[in-house]
Amino acid sequence: TGEDALLKRATVLGNFNPRDYMERRVWITARDGERIPVSLVWHRDCPAQDSPMFITGYGAYEISSDPGFSVSRLSMLDRGVLYAVPHIRGGGEMGRAWYEQGRRLNKKHSFEDFVDATRALQKAHLADAWRTVANGGSAGGLLMGAIANMAPECYAGVEADVPFVDALTSILDPDLPLTVTEWDEWGDPLHDPEVYQYMKSYTPYENVPVAVLEGGNDEAAGDGSADGAATGAVAAAQFPRIFITTSMNDTRVLYVEPLKWLARLQSAGVDAVAKIEVEAGHGGLSGRYKQWEEVSYENAWCMDVMGLAH
């Protein structure tokens, strides 16, 4: 019949009422003219108008970031935060061609789509740039490092979970267990000079802007090209706060990657911190209560950046 039938509803403790929350799908136009869908959620009593925003993305491996309910989101939504998910190229939301436009030598489309979605929401006065926090993990952590380098003025904070931020170094080492299979997603920089130069132009670790030092030193660590991840020198005060999570037993993204990135960020004067889990793997802590503690810690940092923790 085409009619929806509710078969089961999870119990949510507290005074949760699903009618208190609004959702909407909007479309923004990326810099190359492509239309990007963005999913939005906010509390009915907190109209999305220059709101603090939590914007999250992934955009890799043809994985779809489908909208879904999460109890952990309620705390921020109830404080007036706009929750946004841009369905950027590199994911699988819009079919195979959508994925192909965000992989290998098209990877920068993923970063540009995310930044363009952020700017569109801010320009429409739905979100406030001074209270916007971006989030992504693993390949989405690479996305976070890239967008922080590309458009630091758009974000007050960036949370990067187990981030793949030194991708070039890792993918150049065929002795690592996942390297050769990852060439299908990112390209093979070991044997293809074009892929090497392309990855070098966007890999977060390679493109951290150097702080404007006393005396006028305004060189950049990256190539500073207009279409790359680096955009030239950025004063540390203009760069978003960075929160990194990593795990000592992560076999997918070795902990040395985010910690190298942390060291380079801090040497550039950026307000960057890391939370290191000794016993966790790529998926974070195991055990329901440990996972809730981890989420609450991350949410507390985000709300502090947004000015909502007081």
Functional labels for PLM-detected ranges:
Residues 2, 8-130, 137, 172, ...:
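Cap/lid segment of the alpha/beta-hydrolase catalytic domain
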